[in-house]
Amino acid sequence: MPYLQKPAKQKNRQINREDRRKIYDTSQWRKLRSAYLQQHPLCQLCQQEGKIVPAVDIHHIISFMSTNDHLKRLALAYNPDNLMSLCKECHQKVHNQP
């Protein structure tokens, strides 16, 4: 019976997903996210356009997945200066930009 190997790209996505979960599933992240949303309850991009829209997501300005260095990854993930509060629509726009 032939062995079907997962394509490398799909394997990498799975590994990335697992690495992201290691951050997002921590109590440290949940507390930081909650505190940041309390301090920045409005979408920061909508505010720049003069709109008042509640934020529901927290976006990392520099993705913590942009490095393979564990310490740098943690620093990017938990640095409040690397975060933005966004509405769903703006968060999708940011991630869909080329």
Predicted features and spans:
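Intrinsic structural disorder/low-complexity segments
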Residues: 13, 62-63, 94, 98
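Short N-terminal micro-motifs specific to bacterial/archaeal maturation
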Residues: 20, 34, 74-77
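Generic N-terminal initiation segments characterized by hydrophobic and/or small/turn-forming residues
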Residues: 1, 34, 80-83
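A boundary/linker detector
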Residues: 1-31, 47-54
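Short Cys/His-centered divalent metal-binding micro-motifs
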Residues: 50-51, 80-98
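Short cysteine-rich loop/turn motifs with clustered Cys
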Residues: 28-65, 89
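Short linker/helix segments within small regulatory modules
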Residues: 65-82
